[in-house]
Amino acid sequence: MMVSFTARAKSNVMAYRLLAYSQGDDIIEISHAAENTIPDYVAVKDVDKGDLTQVNMYPLAAWQVIAGSDIKVGDNLTTGKDGTAVPTDDPSTVFGYAVEEAQEGQLVTLVISRSKEISIEVDDIKDAGDTGKRLLKINTPSGARNIIIENEDAKALINGETTNTNKKNLQDLLFSDGNVKAFLQATTTDENKTALQQLLVSNADVLGLLSGNPTSDNKINLRTMIGAGVPYSLPAATTTTLGGVKKGAAVTASTATDVATAVKDLNSLITVLKNAGIIS
């Protein structure tokens, strides 16, 4: 489908030159496209500055444009001086490619295409810095990490190749507390251990347990924490109730050689058993 509109020449326009549009006060204005830009149209006749002209837009796949320099078949093209077509290696400004050779000043036929496959070299990317270009050229994860991470100890950590020196340096980087460093280096003193307990545990009763010297209150609270309740006291044993008994006093072996003395020794044993609560 053809689209037609009226435009005003913003400057003198020459036939078969590449054009760009701009917005005027009340009308579209046209002029030669700037160098190294993508054009919008191509002129098919001369137009003087300030004159109105009818712009007819056809669904064309190719243009004929004045060559601004010698052009070879297949050259990628961009806008040259005064709206001419010139070869370019900058993929961001390519608008087509030549299908025939042309010398400077001759008409060249070109296919309008921005989808032509273009090989982009990393070094040609203008907005990329040296570090970015180095990163784009890397094809291994470890190589990329070596560019992104400057610290040698951090590199060793990420690559899984830490030495003892790397480990110590990383601990110095990551931790400011000397007690934590001592723990990580397996060189804790009693003072370090006490300080670490204070860092890790807020409960006073647990701290008392860890110190190896819990108070009576600590013990009671710890038993409550673990659901042990209060200490169990055995009831006194009776003839009908199982209970606790005390150890009886020592009793020497009887040396009686007559009945009276044997009875006396037996009664002494019975007294000891009663006192211990073993018998009633």
From Swiss-Prot:
Keyword Ion transport carried by entry? no
Instruction: Spell out the subcellular localization from the entry.
Output: Virion
Keyword entries, A-Z: Host-virus interaction, Late protein, Viral attachment to host cell, Virion, Virus entry into host cell
In terms of InterPro entries, this protein maps to: Phage_B103_Gp8
Family designation: Belongs to the phi29likevirus major capsid fiber protein family.
Q: Could you describe the subunit structure of this protein? A: Homotrimer. Forms a super helix coiled coil in the homotrimer.
Q: What is this protein identified as?
A: Capsid fiber protein
Write down the species: Bacillus phage phi29 (Bacteriophage phi-29)
